[in-house]
C-alpha cells in the first residue's frame, strides 16, 4: 500500500457510469467490500473485493451525441476538472518545433509517490469557517435549481481546501477551485430556469455585487457578462472567484443563445 496505483477510464461516459460503476460508488463511503459471488475463491476470483486505499480512479469525459451525462450520485462523489484549449495554447502547439514524445513522461512522477500517499491518507478535519458565509449563499441559490449539495460535498470541500492550502494555494483561490470542481458540475437547465440563478451565482463571485446590484440584474449582466478579456480593470479586480465566475459567465452566454446549458457543455 505504499505506492499509488491509478485506474484510468478513458471516455468513461460512453456508457452509463452509475450503472457499470454502481458497486464501487456504493462502497466509496462505507469502505465495505464489493460482493463478487456467494462461494469461496473461484477461478482466482475472491467472493468479495476490497478497494485498497492506494487505488485512485481517473476518468476522461467527452460530451457529444454518443455519450451520457453524469447523474448527481456520480458527481457528488467526484472532483470534476475541466480542461479547455485556448487559441493561445493551439498557436503555441502548432508553432512549436519540438516533437511530442510521450516516452519523456515515463516514470517522471515516481519521486512524488511518498508525498502523494501521505497526503491522500491524511485524516483532516474540515475547516469551512473562512468560507462558511459564501458556501451558504451558494447552497441557497443552487437549491432553487435542484442542484444543492449535502453533508458529503461540504466535507469534501473542506478536505479539498485543506489539500490545496498544503500545496501552496491561498486566499480566495481555495474556495474558487472548490466551487468549480464540486458545486457547478451539477448545474444544468433551460433559460427560464437558469437565467436568474446564474446571474445570482455570478454576483456571489464579485465583491459587494450582491449589495451594489440589488434588484439590478440586467445592469450586472451588462457590466460583467462580457468576454472575460474585455472586462475593465476595475471590474476584473472585484472578481474574487475568477475561475468560477468565468465558467458561470460562459454558461449564461450558452443558455441565452441556445436556450439550455450545462457545466459539461459550456
Task: Identify the meaning behind each predicted range.
Residues 1-266:
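C-terminal regulatory/interaction module of P-loop NTP-utilizing enzymes
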Amino acid at each position: 500500500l505504499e505506492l499509488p496505483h491509478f485506474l484510468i477510464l478513458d471516455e468513461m461516459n460512453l456508457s452509463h457510469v452509475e450503472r457499470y460503476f454502481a458497486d464501487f460508488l456504493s462502497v466509496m463511503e462505507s469502505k465495505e467490500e464489493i460482493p463478487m459471488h456467494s462461494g469461496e475463491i473461484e477461478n482466482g476470483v475472491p467472493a468479495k473485493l476490497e478497494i485498497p486505499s492506494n487505488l485512485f480512479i481517473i476518468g476522461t469525459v467527452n460530451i457529444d451525441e454518443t455519450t451520457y451525462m453524469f447523474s448527481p450520485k456520480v458527481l457528488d462523489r467526484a472532483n470534476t476538472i475541466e480542461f479547455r484549449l485556448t487559441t493561445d495554447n493551439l498557436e503555441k502547439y502548432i508553432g512549436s518545433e519540438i516533437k511530442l514524445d510521450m516516452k519523456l513522461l515515463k516514470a517522471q512522477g515516481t519521486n512524488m509517490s511518498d508525498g502523494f500517499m501521505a497526503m491522500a491518507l491524511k485524516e483532516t478535519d474540515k475547516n469551512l469557517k473562512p468560507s462558511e458565509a459564501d458556501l451558504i449563499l451558494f447552497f441557497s441559490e443552487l437549491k432553487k435549481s435542484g442542484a444543492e449539495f449535502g453533508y458529503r460535498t461540504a466535507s469534501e470541500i473542506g478536505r479539498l481546501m485543506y489539500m490545496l492550502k498544503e500545496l501552496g494555494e491561498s486566499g480566495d483561490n481555495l474556495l474558487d477551485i472548490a466551487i468549480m470542481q464540486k458545486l457547478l458540475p451539477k448545474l444544468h437547465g433551460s433559460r427560464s430556469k437558469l437565467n436568474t440563478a446564474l446571474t445570482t451565482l455570478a454576483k456571489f463571485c464579485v465583491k459587494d455585487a450582491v449589495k451594489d446590484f440589488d434588484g439590478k440584474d440586467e445592469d450586472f449582466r451588462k457590466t460583467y457578462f462580457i468576454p472575460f478579456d474585455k472586462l475593465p480593470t476595475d471590474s476584473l479586480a472585484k472578481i474574487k472567484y475568477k475561475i468560477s465566475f468565468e465558467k458561470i459567465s460562459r454558461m449564461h452566454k450558452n443558455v441565452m443563445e441556445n436556450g439550455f446549458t450545462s457545466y459539461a457543455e459550456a
